[in-house]
Amino acid sequence: MAPAGHILTLLLWGHLLELWTPGHSANPSYPRLRLSHKELLELNRTSIFQSPLGFLDLHTMLLDEYQERLFVGGRDLVYSLNLERVSDGYREIYWPSTAVKVEECIMKGKDANECANYIRVLHHYNRTHLLTCATGAFDPHCAFIRVGHHSEEPLFHLESHRSERGRGRCPFDPNSSFVSTLVGNELFAGLYSDYWGRDSAIFRSMGKLGHIRTEHDDERLLKEPKFVGSYMIPDNEDRDDNKMYFFFTEKALEAENNAHTIYTRVGRLCVNDMGGQRILVNKWSTFLKARLVCSVPGMNGIDTYFDELEDVFLLPTRDPKNPVIFGLFNTTSNIFRGHAVCVYHMSSIREAFNGPYAHKEGPEYHWSLYEGKVPYPRPGSCASKVNGGKYGTTKDYPDDAIRFARMHPLMYQPIKPVHKKPILVKTDGKYNLRQLAVDRVEAEDGQYDVLFIGTDTGIVLKVITIYNQETEWMEEVILEELQIFKDPAPIISMEISSKRQQLYIGSASAVAQVRFHHCDMYGSACADCCLARDPYCAWDGISCSRYYPTGAHAKRRFRRQDVRHGNAAQQCFGQQFVGDALDRTEERLAYGIESNSTLLECTPRSLQAKVIWFVQKGRDVRKEEVKTDDRVVKMDLGLLFLRVRKSDAGTYFCQTVEHNFVHTVRKITLEVVEEHKVEGMFHKDHEEERHHKMPCPPLSGMSQGTKPWYKEFLQLIGYSNFQRVEEYCEKVWCTDKKRKKLKMSPSKWKYANPQEKRLRSKAEHFRLPRHTLLS
């Protein structure tokens, strides 16, 4: 891109950020809660399956609610996992490539790892069998797996005697882009169907309708596509009018100024397409495609586009003809990386395919709207009763209709999202968004779509979006950030079970399940529950628990929930806080050494809460807000005094503000010790310490060689007298009073106060104990 182009991109991107910011809360990029892998395990909210062989190389997953199993395809293996707990009771099928095939594959120049048998296809074939296809050392083949009826003895057996060639059903390359859908006994697949990965095509095979595909080497149909998803969606009650939709990205022919421009497409064809009689024989005669747009409106009509589709999710509704389509997109710019989620209604998609065709007279002409006569039956329509019933199959269509469809596969009108803009935009660059799953939830104040977004670091974001019709702004609320795997790993597959309230997540090396919610984690007070804004959770008068819109579990008198506004003050007015949990303010005593640094720690549970510090210098003195400067700094961890003064002594109040709800989280009394008194301590007779009956014990839970947290912090902020301060702290901790406390049993000493135990167990961050406070 030329320098001028770089400047334009920078300006557009800056405007995008400016445009998007007003619709968000104070910290839109922060999740409200951040849970580590360790915390998820301790909450019993997750379960992890890892192959006993040490590798998995997951490529596909299939959720089977009927069999209550999750089927996983990897390298040389197919696994059957328990939906209740994926780490328990797994079964496996070992299905490697033959030694002869592997040797041939390597001799042709492929890497030995690529010459394994990677399972790429898993579909329900009927109630007792699965269809599976695998790469077979660059010689794809398919077979059936017998799983039996749900009521029978569990079965999991590969019927290898029914193996068939898999060309056109499964790619040769294990890493090639690929999608497939089984409709009846017909397998529809979008793939690269040759050994060298050059022949991109959409196939139908296996069933009674016969083998059919897109034309070879016709860039008007497919130009270097990356297949993302495929679904069968009916248009009406006539099954002969059913259509297959393929979602993919490709190089756009109509972007004449840049041959490398990527667009996202929706391709459509009739399930019962038989091809033409004289033209397009055994080729799709109803294939059409339209551009799928996801963009943010910009200055002077110049939009910022997210052109590359990463994932697509179809959310079923009560009407099977009108599911909601969610697309996860990213930018194709080499300068900036951004991601967006757009939502599409089927009415917009059908409108584009029923609209005008795109047309180009010749190489010297531009693409334009076709204004000539359109033949009958309309190109792209199915042979059905809805279409007049005049034609039994597409083979009966007139040649001019087939010829027109062949020359005009592209629709002129693009498909635009709901509200004509994304529901979610992420431009912080923290991680790349890769996978998307959606659950629709009924809450007290309406219906919400909860987005679960998988990233390239093993993080899953749980997000809701709220559209304000008056201002036309979209508020995104990141409810949780979940670290699914212990070690960062890209999420490559996600399956969702609304019935079980579980999300199943696959990486290359492991499969995890995680519950949608854990309501009592939010806190034991009404305000805690309402501030969470989680549509799965509500205050029932006793605790924060699962919200049930109707039925026996509903407690209409006591439910308190406000997802749209999070107005805890209004919702919880008159509610008694259990154990006065919210009224109770944690009190601490802290010491600071004059002219050195001190941190008053306060980390609210919610990362979206604003923290305000107040100080009171005497009992009868009014509280004042702490003024920060180059000496007193407000940090995420608390209030940092770079150089403590005697005048800083007082009582400090850490208050959080979230949706206008104010809560005092912590009260810290700071006592400042004069530096010369600390110096005097080191001139005392050291013999006194040698006569102590009990030596100063090491910090609980700290292994030998582990550096206490405060040492790292003191070195980080640059204490001028680090060694003396360290010695002073050890002397303070080793007083006779402290030794008496340490004589208690370890379990009693660690959590002498039940309230402290509860607070510690629900703490957001795990770290070494800080036995620094004397009361």
Curated annotation (Swiss-Prot):
Species for this entry: Mus musculus
Deleted gene: phenotype: Embryos present defects in the patterning of intersomitic vasculature.
Disulfide bonds: 105-115, 133-142, 270-382, 294-342, 519-537, 654-729
Function: Plays an important role in signaling via the cell surface receptor PLXND1. Mediates reorganization of the actin cytoskeleton, leading to the retraction of cell projections. Promotes focal adhesion disassembly and inhibits adhesion of endothelial cells to the extracellular matrix. Regulates angiogenesis, both during embryogenesis and after birth. Can down-regulate sprouting angiogenesis. Required for normal vascular patterning during embryogenesis. Plays an important role in ensuring the specificity of synapse formation.
Protein name as annotated: Semaphorin-3E
GO molecular function (one): semaphorin receptor binding
Domain Ig-like C2-type: 581-669
Pfam families: ig, Sema
Family from the record: Belongs to the semaphorin family.
Distribution of this protein across tissues and organs: Detected in neurons in the thalamus. Detected in embryonic vasculature. Developing lungs, developing skeletal elements and ventral horns of the developing neural tube. Correlates positively with tumor progression.
GO cellular component terms listed in the entry, alphabetical order: extracellular region; extracellular space
Primary site of residence: secreted
Residues listed as glycosylation sites in the UniProt record: 44, 126, 175, 330, 596
SUBUNIT field: Interacts with PLXND1.
